[in-house]
Swiss-Prot record:
Transmembrane segments: 10-30, 54-74, 99-119, 120-140, 149-169, 186-206, 223-243, 258-278, 300-320, 322-342, 343-363, 371-391
Principal cellular location given in the protein's record: membrane
Name by which UniProt lists this protein: Putative ion-transport protein YfeO
Source organism (scientific name): Escherichia coli O7:K1 (strain IAI39 / ExPEC)
UniProt xrefs under NCBIfam families: PRK03655.1
Matches recorded under Pfam families: Voltage_CLC
Length: 418
């Protein structure tokens, strides 16, 4: 016979697995549609028209039209494509299901059109809303928070292809009774995360790791170097934190979302022309291209880091539906490669991983997620103790500092209301 604690844990196991699988399938379908549309917009269509896909005209035109298209969706869809992600944390309150079709369309258009945002926030919003709406109907005795946690865990597992990230994140956020062991509370979320990760793995494998030279033995000077790199990344990130609410307020002076996002798309196009196609899109595939390109110099990496960070701020401030974590990782990689090129004595494994740790910490203010992203992009067990030590001064630097999020105005513009 199972102990009552075990029966309690098993109670949500089946819903957790179902939510994890569904979370992954929604992500896969959205990413597949976005990939097909991206191929049409950036390969087939310019080839048919006899235009180079990396020509300034095409980059500016596609991003401007993408902004206009997303603006039309936000303006006219029911629920106005959900809340503005710039005003929301990664895991937020459930939105009405009526807003989800518009949100999914806006996300697909942004991903395919080259906007410098990732899928994580909208996918999280969609999965939470569906889990709460369906779960409340099927099992009304389970509260909304439980469904939110399961959907969040399933989505995190699906996004990163492993339940480890969910375990790390929820180990610090599940504040239950002290009489209930932590792993009892983690059981169902980890089931959801594992189901999401395994389902994603059946269709594709998220490829985060970079081919960076292996890091051997840790030395004391490496800790100092890593702390300096993380501090530089934090400084760069805090500039973006300062800019985001100000640019957001400026952009939202334009009351028409079609015009506002059209202007935002045009600015993104200009930034894309300056730094090239590798600075477009969510950043994961592009950072692989950046590392593989041996022709990039210190100034090239610096330009890519600055432009990608600027594009992230512009996209978020303009109201595009997307997340900030994936493009932030790209910024960290570019910054780390730049610092390694500038000071070759510091191994690239240290500069890249510590830069990712610093910039993701600014964006998420989540120590475990920052450590996880740094560790999966530069997978080297020798780095783990160094990253844990470097996290300490980085966390001190950010204590009490504002987050990369816009305070929600008392009365949002009509197109952002749900």
């Amino acid at each position: 016979m199972l102990h009552p604690r075990a029966r309690t844990m098993l109670l949500l196991s089946l819903p957790a697995v179902a939510i994890g699988i569904a979370s992954s399938l929604i992500l896969i379908v959205v990413m597949k549609i976005a990939s097909v549309l991206q191929n049409l917009l950036w390969l087939r269509l310019p080839g048919t028209l006899g235009i180079a896909q990396d020509s300034p005209f095409w980059i500016i035109a596609i991003l401007t039209l993408t902004g206009i298209a997303v603006g039309l969706v936000i303006r006219f869809s029911q629920g106005h494509a959900g809340p503005d992600p710039a005003c929301e944390p990664l895991i937020g309150a459930p939105v009405p299901p009526s807003a989800l079709p518009g949100l999914i369309v806006a996300l697909i258009l942004g991903l395919a059109g080259g906007v410098s945002l990732g899928p994580e926030h909208p996918i999280m919003t969609v999965n939470i809303a569906l889990a709460v709406a369906i779960g409340a109907r099927l099992l009304p005795r389970v509260n909304r928070m439980e469904w939110t946690i399961l959907a969040s865990a399933g989505t995190i597992g699906a996004l990163f292809g492993t339940p480890v990230a969910a375990a790390l994140i929820f180990s610090q956020t599940l504040n239950g009774s002290s009489e209930v062991p932590l792993w009892d509370r983690l059981f169902a979320p980890l089931m959801a995360a594992a189901a999401g990760a395994l389902t994603t793995g059946l269709f594709f494998h998220p490829h985060f790791s970079l081919p960076i030279a292996h890091y051997g033995q840790m030395e004391m000077t490496d800790i100092l170097s890593g702390a300096i790199v993380a501090a530089i990344a934090i400084a760069a990130g805090m500039i973006a934190v300062w800019c985001l609410p100000r640019l957001h307020a400026m952009m939202h002076q334009i009351k028409n979302p079609v015009l506002m996002l059209g202007v935002g798309g045009f600015i993104l196009g200009i930034l894309g022309v300056i730094a090239g196609p590798v600075s477009l899109f969510k950043g994961l595939d592009e950072m692989q291209q950046m590392v593989a390109n041996q022709a990039f110099s210190t100034s090239d990496y610096f330009l890519l880091a600055v432009i990608k960070l600027a594009a992230l701020v512009v996209a978020a401030a303009s109201g595009f539906r997307g997340g900030r974590i994936f493009p932030a990782v790209f910024v960290g990689v570019a910054l780390g490669l730049m610092l390694h090129e500038h000071v070759p004595a510091v191994p690239a494994a240290i500069t890249v991983s510590c830069a990712i740790l610093g910039i993701v910490l600014v964006v998420t203010r989540d120590g475990w997620l920052s450590l996880f992203m740094a560790a999966v992009v530069v997978p080297n067990t020798t780095l783990l103790p160094l990253l844990c030590i470097v996290m300490l001064p980085a966390w001190l630097l950010l204590a009490g500092k504002p987050m990369m999020m816009v305070n929600r105005p008392k009365q949002q513009p009509p197109h952002d209301n749900v």
